[in-house]
């Protein structure tokens, strides 16, 4: 009798446990329906408006591809232009378990490339990926690296300089000696400028500390100043402008933010659009695309940005044809 009662109790308990398990499984979200949160490591070389716009564009591009806040975790770091931090942060981002890593600007991409040969590396705003030894071929990168390149439209810039300031004969190119992409841009700009009958004198600075003194020397030797896509110069562009205050030489930079901050004009690649394209490429790789087979997306044509207010202050007459074709006019 006791055994029958015990068996009954055990059976009842078994039913309760089974029912509980069934209820629990019915109310638990199916694992297969749970979306994996992508992990993306991002290293930005330095803070300045152009690179900040690229980072914003990356986030927007990811969102457009379905990777919104709840579907992607961004592990963001900024080396603030410190090369030693680039190496340390690159290793940290690789070790953090990210699905891939992104380098905004050439030094950041180079740091990440040195830190891993296996994890996908996506370049953002790399002017010369081949010259920077990041990829061997733009159409078929062949390794763990691909991305988006902001090739400087040097020929268009030379044409704009001649259209706005036809009396300019000698241009000073101000750039950082530590950035490989800047050297490549200067060589290309110089070649186009010389074909157009202009003389280009180059002025390289090792860091932001030498910008003021270098600009002071430049202004006594040149008719205008040209600045490539250069993170060192961009991060201290206000120093370039203030050091040129008395000489009032027209400055032709290579980014919209710098035209707004004291440049006369430029032909630029839209940095936000570049970031969006980078974000979409990140999404492709997250979905299974191989960097080795994913061509580098090259932005090679730009739009002109004119600082009309500053041009008038410098006595520069802007042809109507230039104004009509401008992508942006700052009044």
Q: Can you annotate each of these PLM segments?
A:
Residues 58, 146-193, 295-310:
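An alpha-beta-alpha
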Residues 111, 118-154, 251-265:
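Flexible loop/hinge segments that line or gate small-molecule binding clefts
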